[in-house]
Amino acid sequence: MATGLLAKKLGMTQIFTAEGDCIPVTVLEAGPCTVVRRKTAEKDGYDAVVIGWGEVDEKHAHRLTKPEVGVFKKAGTPVFRHVKEIRVKDAKLLGELKAGDVLTVDKVFKQDQRIDVAGVTKGRGFTGVMKRWNMHGAARDSSTTHEHHRHVGAIGQRKTPGKVWKGKHLPGHYGVDNVTIQNLTIVGVEADKNLLLVKGAVPGHNDGLLFVNTAVKGQPRVKKVQEVRARAKPKV
């Protein structure tokens, strides 16, 4: 199967393990996604599949361009609101996929698997340097004017260089950035509800669009994990 799915963030909660440990988890509604197109190295220069998620009704289908609608019409699939292209390195896996195939969460992911989650962070509007860049701020004593406690301070010199360098940390818009959180662990898969329980937090607000993919940095070795857990158990 493909290595990733489009998902929606539902919110955060907590679960308890058999040992009684409390784990914070994020609940994701992942898929089911439909294969819209298959790309091959012979025709397109690389191997990939394009998946779609979130059907668009006839009322809103007119917002798409004719070329966009033509892609779905050629594949014989419904019109989707979100599409994502996934590179596929395994030629055998690519050969098994075809337009119209449905990818469900239990076919793509399993428990204890490592994943990468990409999304857009929450927008926080115009913020100062202390919130945006974690700057320390000026001294809180009588030598500093009250208005300058949270200011950026000096941003350059005099004639040399005679300018403010590009990339200087200044006040500005904070958030709405594309961020990928790597090596998160799946602690639960509920196939009947298309849900993924992911340990930790993921980018964005509730109902935000996410892309969940297999971790690029590899999966943990099962034997090694079992050895670490065995050593961590307290001796009675």
Curated annotation (Swiss-Prot):
Keywords: Ribonucleoprotein, Ribosomal protein, RNA-binding, rRNA-binding. InterPro entries: Ribosomal_uL3 (IPR000597), Ribosomal_uL3_bac/org-type (IPR019927), Ribosomal_uL3_CS (IPR019926), Transl_B-barrel_sf (IPR009000). Part of the 50S ribosomal subunit. Forms a cluster with proteins L14 and L19. Residues 139-163 are annotated as: Disordered. One of the primary rRNA binding proteins, it binds directly near the 3'-end of the 23S rRNA, where it nucleates assembly of the 50S subunit. It holds the Pfam family Ribosomal_L3. NCBIfam families: L3_bact. Gene3D superfamilies: 3.30.160.810, Translation factors. One of its GO terms (molecular function) is rRNA binding. One of its GO terms (cellular component) is cytosolic large ribosomal subunit. This is Large ribosomal subunit protein uL3. One of its GO terms (biological process) is translation. The keyword Transport does not apply. The gene is rplC. HAMAP family: Ribosomal_uL3_B. Belongs to the universal ribosomal protein uL3 family.
